[in-house]
Amino acid sequence: MTNIWFDVAEVSVGQHWYWQLGGYSLHGQVLITSWIVVAVIGVICLLGTQNLQPVSGGSAATAPKGLQNLTEYITEFIRDLAKTQIGEEDYLKWVPFLGTIFLFIFVSNWSGALIPWRILELPNGELAAPTNDINTTVALALLTSIAYFYAGISKKGLGYFKRYISPAAFLLPINILEDLTKPLSLSFRLFGNILADELVVGVLVSLVPLVVPIPIMLLGLFTSAIQALVFATLAGAYIGESVEDHH
């Protein structure tokens, strides 16, 4: 008798398991995997910030270890990224935003590369990394757009919109088009790379023994990390551009 919980689902694209909420249809499988990713990040953060050991005098006995060391390394990495992209004056307030974006995309991408979501069969569609769904990547890109508009307007007020006619008024359509293409490029780049990686691995696993797809899976881990870094770096660059003083 076939066990529906451990049947390998077929590789499919564009099929969704819909949840009905009022008059709206929600992509259930995306919400499930997104909640799992958020839970994993939350647990790691909670465990990594318990019983914090302060460093005094560079002593090895008081140096952070384990998850605390990992969380401090990630925090310093995000802080340095924000400082490089946004600038010394404004970077600190944007560290939480860039850190959240980076961690969510990183863990989502790696969950798609490491967790065999497809062994769990759904009534329709299949489980996959949250970033394998265009709705997720578009939402992340729109959040980034809102963030850099907010950053620019909060610092410069309505004077922020002078950038659209700088250095010449005839550049107005081009500058508007640039702001429209930023979220498009962010969302489709991330979605396309993650979808392609999961499809290639899924097809290889179904056609050949498990050992053969391993190099592709390792490459997928590397690509997943790079995509998270690229998204966070571009988000920081866009915010830095919006708060930059033009003379």
Swiss-Prot record:
Segments passing through the bilayer: 28-48, 95-115, 134-154, 199-219, 220-240
Domain of life: Eukaryota
GO MF annotations, alphabetized: proton-transporting ATP synthase activity, rotational mechanism
Compartment(s) where it occurs, according to its Swiss-Prot or TrEMBL record: Plastid, Chloroplast thylakoid membrane
Sorted UniProt keywords: ATP synthesis, CF(0), Chloroplast, Hydrogen ion transport, Ion transport, Membrane, Plastid, Thylakoid, Transmembrane, Transmembrane helix, Transport
Major subcellular location class: plastid
GO cellular component, one term: chloroplast thylakoid membrane
Membrane topology type: Multi-pass membrane protein
Subunit: F-type ATPases have 2 components, CF(1) - the catalytic core - and CF(0) - the membrane proton channel. CF(1) has five subunits: alpha(3), beta(3), gamma(1), delta(1), epsilon(1). CF(0) has four main subunits: a, b, b' and c.
Family: Belongs to the ATPase A chain family.
Function in brief: Key component of the proton channel; it plays a direct role in the translocation of protons across the membrane.
Record protein name field: ATP synthase subunit a, chloroplastic
Lineage of the species this protein comes from: Eukaryota, Viridiplantae, Chlorophyta, core chlorophytes, Trebouxiophyceae
